[in-house]
Each structure stands twice: as C-alpha cells, then as structure tokens.
C-alpha cells in the first residue's frame, strides 16, 4: 500500500471507529452555495477535516470542511461540507479523497454540487441545474488515480452521470 492509499485507510479507520455500524446510502459533496444545506441534515456525527490527519483542507471561502454522517428523510447520508479543488494546488489523489471515502463506506450514489450559474445568464442564485456532461479543461482524469479496487464498475466509461438520477 502506498502513502496515498495509506492516508485513505487511516482517515477511513478513524471515522469508522467513531460511526460504527452507521451505513450511509448517499454521498453529498456540497460546494459553494449549498454548504448551508448541511443544516437540513439530522446529524449523527460531524468530523472537522482539520482534525483528520492526512485529509486535505479546502481553502475556498464558504467551504467549512466538515464531514457529516446523518439523515435526511430517513435516508442515511454522508455529506462533505466543502470540496477540494485541483486549482487549489491539490493533487488528483487529494481531490478524489471524498469519492474514495464514499466508496470505502460502500456508497454507490454520489451527488456533487457546484456553482454553475455562469454558464447561462438566465440562471438565478438558487436555481438547480442538472448536468449531464462537462468539459475538463485540466486534461487530467481524476478516475485514473483511484485505486482499481475502489473504482465503481461502469457500463459506459466516458460519462459518469447516471440517467436515472438526472
């Protein structure tokens, strides 16, 4: 196991020891504008990422850096209150950390949020926009750094969006 995989395992073990048998079904990664959504979660466990050795810290204003285990409408949730960005200087191994933790908790449904209002001037703050594709201007594939044992097997490799959720 290399150092990156060791960091994933250390953080997972620390969290798992605290949450025990709590088994989230859905992972939410809350970006700018929806961090406040965390107030809607009936929280069972909250982890400050500043206290998790090996976990990258978000530097974006408004990203609290909490990992929350809780419930919304009787659905068990793992929520990341703040995202980690490649443009912050983090490696792809660090950017995918929340995805890897979600997979380690056997979560198969992932919902990420972001600010995308700039793509259409008719969008207003708070509008919900479902994306079914994206343009990767970094020319880096974050999936390539996820250990093969933790990758979700997909029928279609080019697009990781799930039509039934959209």
Walk through the language-model features, giving the residues of each.
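Long, non-catalytic terminal segments
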Residues: 1-26, 30-37
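Glycine-rich phosphate- or other oxyanion-binding loops that anchor nucleotides, phosphorylated ligands
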Residues: 2-13, 50-166
């Amino acid at each position: 196991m290399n150092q990156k995989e060791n960091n994933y395992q250390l953080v997972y073990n620390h969290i798992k020891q605290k949450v025990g048998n709590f088994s989230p079904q859905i992972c939410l990664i809350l970006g700018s504008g929806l961090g406040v959504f965390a107030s809607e979660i009936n929280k069972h466990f909250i982890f400050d990422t500043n206290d998790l050795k090996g976990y990258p810290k978000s530097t974006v204003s408004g990203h609290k850096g909490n990992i929350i285990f809780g419930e919304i409408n009787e659905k068990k949730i793992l929520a990341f209150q703040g995202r980690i960005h490649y443009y912050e200087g983090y490696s792809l191994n660090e950017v995918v950390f929340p995805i890897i933790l979600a997979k380690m908790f056997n979560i198969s449904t992932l919902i990420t949020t972001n600010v995308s209002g700039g793509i259409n001037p008719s969008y207003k703050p708070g509008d919900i926009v479902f994306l079914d594709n994206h343009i990767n201007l970094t020319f880096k594939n974050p999936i390539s750094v996820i250990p093969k044992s933790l990758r979700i097997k997909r029928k279609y490799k080019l697009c990781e969006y799930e039509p039934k959720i959209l």
